[in-house]
């Protein structure tokens, strides 16, 4: 007599979690961080048509890592939910926390009830309405419906440990856009260097997708950053850093010349 195959619920959840984590880890990394002017999204994405970063509503943005078809379905569902609620009630009734909760409930239901979980990790971010002085809100939603409120930055997909470590060492609150972009790009390069060989080129602007939620814009805060804009911002940061590094040298030279002149006057 053959017995039916049995698997405990705990083992089933472990296997689903492992499947989802492996699928997310195969994807490219995404970083979202708060800066002085709002929220910056930067994703490692060489494709020009398949986008990981999107607008959900007036002041709310979206970024994802994992399987594109799965998180794109979630993105479109979030846009439809936000549009319907904003039309039925008021545009200010659509918030990032509300959309993050909807995504958490959806992913939690899929994880427990469907045969296969979604291999995705999401970030929902919101900036304050124009004229309000409220800090940006960042929410991370994982494959099993878990939701977390992150105060400064979110790292998803790929190899997250070196990127998170780099951000912990370099992130500064209220940085301007060039500095924030430089911090995010350097962190992503740390993650790509962990996975690549020595002969592979450094992660460049051509392989990046970026956008911001601009808190200083009156209504729709979402704005994509073109690759030419990224190059300009990174060059601006490099020139500022080089200027700052030259200032201490000039002050030291001034002190040395001052000492020499004092010695000459005593003679």
Swiss-Prot record:
Classification via Pfam families: Proteasome
Keyword line: Cytoplasm, Proteasome
Regulation: The formation of the proteasomal ATPase ARC-20S proteasome complex, likely via the docking of the C-termini of ARC into the intersubunit pockets in the alpha-rings, may trigger opening of the gate for substrate entry. Interconversion between the open-gate and close-gate conformations leads to a dynamic regulation of the 20S proteasome proteolysis activity.
Composition-biased stretches (Basic and acidic residues): 234-267
Domain of life: Bacteria
GO molecular function terms listed in the Swiss-Prot or TrEMBL record: threonine-type endopeptidase activity
Region (Disordered) location: 231-267
Cellular component, GO annotation: cytoplasm; proteasome core complex, alpha-subunit complex
PROSITE patterns: PROTEASOME_ALPHA_2
Metabolic or biological pathway, per its Swiss-Prot or TrEMBL entry: Protein degradation; proteasomal Pup-dependent pathway
Major place of residence: cytoplasm
Disulfide bonds: none
Record carries keyword Cytoplasm: yes
Location of the protein in the cell: Cytoplasm
GO terms classed as biological process: modification-dependent protein catabolic process; proteasomal protein catabolic process
CDD domains reported in the protein's UniProt record: proteasome_protease_HslV
Family: Belongs to the peptidase T1A family.
SUBUNIT field: The 20S proteasome core is composed of 14 alpha and 14 beta subunits that assemble into four stacked heptameric rings, resulting in a barrel-shaped structure. The two inner rings, each composed of seven catalytic beta subunits, are sandwiched by two outer rings, each composed of seven alpha subunits. The catalytic chamber with the active sites is on the inside of the barrel. Has a gated structure, the ends of the cylinder being occluded by the N-termini of the alpha-subunits. Is capped by the proteasome-associated ATPase, ARC.
Protein purpose: Component of the proteasome core, a large protease complex with broad specificity involved in protein degradation.
Protein name: Proteasome subunit alpha
Species of the source: Mycobacterium marinum (strain ATCC BAA-535 / M)
């Amino acid at each position: 007599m053959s017995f039916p195959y049995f698997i405990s619920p705990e083992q089933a959840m472990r296997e689903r979690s492992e499947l989802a984590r492996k699928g997310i880890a195969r994807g490219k990394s995404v970083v979202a961080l708060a800066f002085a002017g709002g929220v910056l999204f930067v994703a490692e994405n060489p494709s020009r048509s398949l986008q990981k970063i999107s607008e959900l509503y007036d002041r709310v943005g979206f970024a994802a890592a994992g399987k594109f078809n799965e998180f794109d379905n979630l993105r479109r569902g979030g846009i439809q939910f936000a549009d319907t609620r904003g039309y039925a009630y008021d545009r200010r009734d659509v918030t990032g926390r509300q959309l993050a909760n909807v995504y958490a409930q959806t992913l939690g239901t899929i994880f427990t009830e469907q045969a296969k979980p979604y291999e995705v990790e999401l970030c929902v971010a919101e900036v304050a309405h124009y004229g309000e002085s409220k800090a940006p809100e960042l929410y991370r939603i994982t494959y099993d419906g878990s939701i977390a409120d992150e105060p400064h930055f979110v790292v998803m997909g790929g190899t997250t440990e070196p990127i998170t470590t780099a951000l912990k060492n370099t992130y500064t609150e209220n940085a301007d856009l060039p500095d924030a972009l430089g911090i995010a790009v350097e962190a992503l390069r740390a993650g790509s260097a962990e996975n690549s060989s020595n002969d592979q080129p450094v992660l460049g602007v051509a392989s990046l997708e970026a956008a911001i939620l601009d808190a200083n814009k009156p209504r729709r805060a979402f704005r994509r950053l073109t690759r030419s804009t990224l190059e300009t911002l990174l060059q601006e940061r490099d020139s500022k850093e080089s200027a700052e590094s030259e200032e201490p040298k000039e002050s030291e030279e001034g002190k040395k010349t001052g000492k020499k002149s004092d010695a000459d006057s005593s003679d």
